[in-house]
């Protein structure tokens, strides 16, 4: 049963100014921070941050709740983004971007 749908749209270039250590620690889990450190190129770093921000916002909207961003870990597995909460809720995630706009969608399903 679907329990919620969340959508978020961001401008990728806005993350150019948001690369402080404080912002990174508030947005990313430790594992995500380690992945971020391996991303080469400013544009790719902006996209990495925009994807995580937008997916986490969409997830919170789908769940109709708000928590710390670091409570959610986004992983890219076989080309698809995933986030596990618990065995009772499955999250279906999707992103798309064109130019400087990125849209993320999350569907929360009770299983």
From Swiss-Prot:
Its cofactor is Mg(2+). Its EC number is 2.7.8.7. Mg(2+) binds at residues 8, 57. Keywords: Cytoplasm, Fatty acid biosynthesis, Fatty acid metabolism, Lipid biosynthesis, Lipid metabolism, Magnesium, Metal-binding, Transferase. Its main location: cytoplasm. It is found in: Cytoplasm. It comes from the Bacteria. GO terms for cellular component: cytoplasm. GO terms for molecular function: holo-[acyl-carrier-protein] synthase activity; magnesium ion binding. One of its GO terms (biological process) is fatty acid biosynthetic process. It catalyses: apo-[ACP] + CoA = holo-[ACP] + adenosine 3',5'-bisphosphate + H(+). It is an enzyme of class 2 (transferase). Transfers the 4'-phosphopantetheine moiety from coenzyme A to a Ser of acyl-carrier-protein. Belongs to the P-Pant transferase superfamily. AcpS family. NCBIfam families: pantethn_trn (TIGR00556), PRK00070.4-1 (NF000835). This is Holo-[acyl-carrier-protein] synthase. It comes from Mycoplasmoides gallisepticum (strain R(low / passage 15 / clone 2)). The lineage of its organism: Bacteria, Bacillati, Mycoplasmatota, Mycoplasmoidales, Mycoplasmoidaceae. The gene is acpS.
């Amino acid at each position: 049963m679907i329990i919620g749908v969340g959508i978020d749209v961001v401008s990728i270039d806005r993350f150019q100014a948001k690369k402080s250590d404080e912002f990174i620690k508030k947005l990313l889990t430790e594992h995500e921070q380690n992945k971020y450190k391996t991303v080469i190129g400013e544009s790719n770093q902006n996209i990495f941050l925009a994807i995580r921000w937008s997916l986490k916002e969409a997830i919170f909207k789908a769940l109709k709740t708000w928590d710390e961003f670091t409570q959610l870990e986004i992983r890219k597995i076989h080309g698809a983004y995933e986030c596990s909460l618990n065995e009772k809720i499955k999250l279906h995630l999707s992103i798309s971007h064109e130019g400087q706009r990125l849209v993320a969608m999350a569907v929360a399903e009770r299983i």
